[in-house]
C-alpha cells in the first residue's frame, strides 16, 4: 500500500545496497576496488575498505594500511604523503557505519507507513534526523575515499557517492513528510481557532433557529439482563421523535352559511313550514329542506305557509269600508278576521255543530259595513282577501297544509281544532266562514321566493257569491279518507293546483294519519262525503230558491260594486299597479232553471301514490302546458260571451259540457257562460255560488 513514506523507503534501500557493496570491496570482493592502479615491476594494485591486493596476493582483512611496506615508487604516485595516508586508511571504517545507519533509516521508513507514525510529527522528526546523520556519514566515506585514493579512484568509490546522494534525497523526503503533517495540523489548529472558518458560528445560528423538540416525561427503564453476554451498552434506550400534525382543529364545514348571511328570501325558502298544527299531519304534497344555523341547529319555523314575517304590502280596501277583514288562504272551514264584517271564531269544520267548532252553520252577521268575503275554500287565502279582488300575485311558497280541515257530519273534537280558518263569503254553504288570518302577513309576489312551480287557481268570478243562500243540505255520510280524494290528494283547489309538482315524481306526505285500509284515524264517528257530491247536492237544493233575474237588484251601492269589480277579472297576468279598471259589462242574471248535474267522478278508496293528470277520466290533457291560452286575456274592455244553454251559474252544464264547480268571487255579479275556460279539465273546477252582484267584463 502506497504511503507518503514509500518513496523514502525505496531510496534508503538503494543507498543501503550501494554502501553495502562499498563495504565488501577488496580484499573481500577483489572485483570491487575502491582504488586501483598499475605499477611497473609490481603489477596491478587495488585497495579496499579492509585491505589491498597485488598481483601476487591480498593482505589480511584489517582496518587501515601499513604504507611503509610499499616502495617509494608506489607512495610517490599518490598526492598525500605516506604518513597521512596511513592515518586516513583507518577512517575507511565509516563505510560499514554508513551502511548500518542507512539500514536503520530504511527500517524507520518502513514503520512510517503506519497511520500513527505517519501522522506523528515527532516520529517524522526522528526519521529526518537519522536521515541527516546517514547523509553525513555517507559523505564522510566519500571524502575519505577521495583523500586516500586520489588520483587513483576506482568505481567502488563512485558507488559511495551515489549512496550519499540517495541518502540526501531521503532526508528531503522525510523533511517534506514532516512539513506536510505539521502544516496540516497547523491548518486544523487555525480552523479550530477561527469560529467562522470552522462553522461554529453557522451551527450556533442553526441551533438558535431550530425548533424546540418536545421533551417527554421520564420513561420507565428496562431492567438489564445479566448473563454470559450481559452488559450495559452506552446506546440510548429511548428515542424521541417529533411528528408534525397536519390535521386541523377546525370542524366547521367550508360550505356552511351562517344565519347572518341569509337574506329574508333565503330564510323563507330554506325553512320548512310547520307540517303539524296541534298534532295534525301535513297535507302538503311537497316538502322544503330544513334550514340550519351555523351551529347545525334547525332554524325556528316560519308561519304555516312559508310566508316571510315583516312589513307587508296591504292591498287597497284591506280594512276600509266595503272591504273584507284579512283572512287566510282559500282553505276549508274559514272564518272572517277582526275586520269589519267578520264571522264566528275559527275552530275547523264539522257538521251542523255549534259555531265554535266544526264547519256547521254561519256565524253572526258581519259587523259594520264589511262586504262578503271569499268562499271557504281549500287553503288559506292570501293576506288582504277582504271582499274585493286581491291585486297581488299568488304566493310563491308551495301549497302548505290547509288549515281548518275537518270532516263532514256531527261535530267531533278534531286534531285540527286550533288550525286557522280561511275566509268565506257572506252567504256561503253551511260550515264556511270568514276567519281571521293572524300572524305573518303575505307580501307581494317575488320570483326569487318561488320554491316549486305550480298551477294557479283562478280567482272566483264576480257576481256569484252575492245571491241569497238556499236551504242547508244534509250531506250523505260515507266512510272514506278524511277529505282525501284520488291518489292521496284532497279535492281542493290548492291540491289540484299542485299537479305540476306531482308530475315531477313528488310523492304524498308519508306522515298522513291513515291506517292500512286507507281510512282516517281521526275517530269512529268521522264520516266523509266527496266534496263534489256535496256541492252538487247543495246546488240542487239551493238553486231553486234563487230569486228571478228581474226581481234581483243590487244589494250594494254602485260605487261599492265598481270598486269590487275593478280588478275582479285579474288573473295575475298583469302587475296590480298597472291593472286598468274595466268598464261595467252587461249585468245579466243567470237562468233560473240551471241546475248542476250530479258528479260523475268518485275519488273514494283510491290508493295513495303519485298521480298524473293523464289518469283523469274527463281530462283530454296530460299537462298544464297543453292547455290553450285564452285569446282574450289581454283585451281590456271586451264584453263577455252570452250564457251557454244548460250551464248553471257556477260553471257546470249539461249535454256534452263537463260539469265543474262555479268560480266564486266576492262582490261580483252572476256568472255567465264565459267562466267555462276550465271545463276541459275537471280537476281545476273551483267552488262558487250564485250571487246578486252584477259582474263586469274585463281581461282574463
Swiss-Prot record:
Coiled coil feature spans: none
Biased composition (Low complexity): 657-671
Subcellular location: Cell membrane
Stretches assigned to the Extracellular side: 30-90, 145-152
Primary location: membrane
Gene Ontology, cellular component aspect: cell division site; growing cell tip; plasma membrane
Region of interest: Disordered: 226-491, 507-560, 573-700
Extent of Polar residues compositional bias: 414-424, 593-603, 615-637
Transmembrane segments: 9-29, 91-111, 124-144, 153-173
Protein keywords: Cell membrane, Membrane, Transmembrane, Transmembrane helix
Its job: Required for the proteolytic cleavage of the transcription factor pacc-1 in response to alkaline ambient pH.
Family listed: Belongs to the palI/RIM9 family.
Protein name: pH-response regulator protein palI/prr-5
Lineage: Eukaryota, Fungi, Dikarya, Ascomycota, Pezizomycotina
Gene from which this protein is expressed: prr-5
